[in-house]
Each structure stands twice: as C-alpha cells, then as structure tokens.
C-alpha cells in the first residue's frame, strides 16, 4: 500500500478500550479521535491519564481490549507490520546504540526497514545536516550531548520516511537552544507533510507547536480542539498576580493576602506562588478583564498591611485549561 490520500485521517481511533487484569477501571475508556494528515497533534493528560496506553496501542506495543485504531491506513491490530512500516516512535529516554556512530545508528535503522543501501546513505547525509549533526556523524553516540542525542533519535526515526511520527516529551531536559532547534524541526516536518503526534507535559510547547490538542484523563477524552479554541471555551477571565512585602509581626502574609483577595467580587480563587522570602507572591484567578480588578485587588492587599511591590496581569492559556479540566491534585 502507498501513502494515504490527503483526505484520509493519518490516525483514526474509534471507541478504543484497554482494560488490564485486576484493574477496577479501564486504562483507556472509549476514546475516539482523528488526526489529520500533516497535522501536529498533541495528546495531553496527567500521569496515569491513559495517553501513554493510547499511544502504545497506536504504535502496536499494546493490544487494545476493543475498538479500532488505524495509522496511515493500516489497522494496528489486524496488520501490525504494515502499521510499523508507516510510523516511527521517538521515546523520551535515549535508546541509541552507544557502540555505534551517529551515522551508523541511522544506517542500521534504515536497513532494518528495507531501505536500499544507496538511498539510506543519501537519507543519512541529508538528515544529519538537517538536524545539525553533520560534524558529529562519525562520533560514537556515547560522546554526544543530550540535545544532540534527542536530535539524532528524531533523525533516525525519519530514515524510513514514516507517515506518522510519535514524539514523547520531545524537549524534556534540553537547554533552551536545543529546545528551540527541536521545535523548529517539528515545524519543518509539518511543512514537509509528516504527521506528528506528540505527548508532552509542557503546555507552552503544546500551545506553540500543536494545530490541535486532545486532553485526556481517567482514560477518557475530555476535549479536543485548537489551543486557542480550548482557551476560549474553558476560560473567560485571567489572573492578577501580586508580589507583597509583609508588615511587621505577620508571619503568613501570603495567607492573609489570599483571604483578603478571595473576598473581592470577581475573584474565583487564589494560589501562593514561589517567591523569595520575606516577600510573598499570590496569584488570583478572576472572571472577566483582570485590569478591571486592579483597584479592588490593591485595596484588599492594603487592608492586610502588606505593601505591593509588583503586579502582573495574565491572560488564560492552555495550562489553565488543562488544570480546569483535570484538576490540581498531584498524580
């Protein structure tokens, strides 16, 4: 079979269920979604939400209990080899062969997938240059940095020209320069027509890279849309964040400020944020325009005797949506 047509979804999931023995609930509980061809799609969720199991099914590593999953036109349960030939996975943790050079890692991967010798050499040279690894091509993998290893894993995954690329936390642990480079390469892949499905806990990364995102929790898909549409649908306010210095004799200035702010009309809730002592930082989530609440917020803080040293207004973002849908409880 060739590449899927432009109208067919790159990934299609229908009523997917995965139940593990001796578990009270399904790890994946009736999830359905479709990923468009050439799209960067983010699958987000807390630890244990079911996203890893869902990706495991899509990449043929986990067998579903019921439902249907298709990747690049191949049913992952009915024809796993065909699905594996059309997809590639870049794990969060490096799994490169440390005894080989960067180039050899790419060549061996392509040979495994049946790419001819001349073509795999050409692809390796091209990908090493595209991912800024040309000068490290003949270096042993155990001598490359973490950022270089991440880039090399993505390059290796592309050696058999997959139609769908699965990225697991692609920029975790990278320095800012390496993170920026990886994100630029993901955008480049989209321009070249490769479908990318990424899982990440980095909401900024998801908001910046993804055309659409699906948020899952407790095995179910809670919502799916563009980042902007999700923010508009689930957030209608913003935040007012204040940094204060305490009056003499007050040990818990953050607690006092939070209590005062929570009595202000329009304040939905407050959180204490990290700050250098003795200062305290409190963020209030508000309904409507946060600028309209500046005066009552200032009055509330003044009533505690604390002195405001900094104020910041914030608009809702994807992280606010994520917390709104999945809660604040640690997993």
Regions found by a protein language model. Name each.
Residues 107, 111, 118-136:
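Conserved ABC ATPase "signature" region
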Residues 161:
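Conserved catalytic motifs of ABC-family nucleotide-binding domains
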Residues 2-12, 17-30, 37, 80:
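A short, flexible loop at the N-terminus of ABC-type nucleotide-binding domains that lies
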Residues 183-287:
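ABC transporter nucleotide-binding domain
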Residues 165-168:
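Catalytic Walker B motif of ABC-type/P-loop ATPase nucleotide-binding domains
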Residues 140-144:
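Conserved ABC ATPase signature
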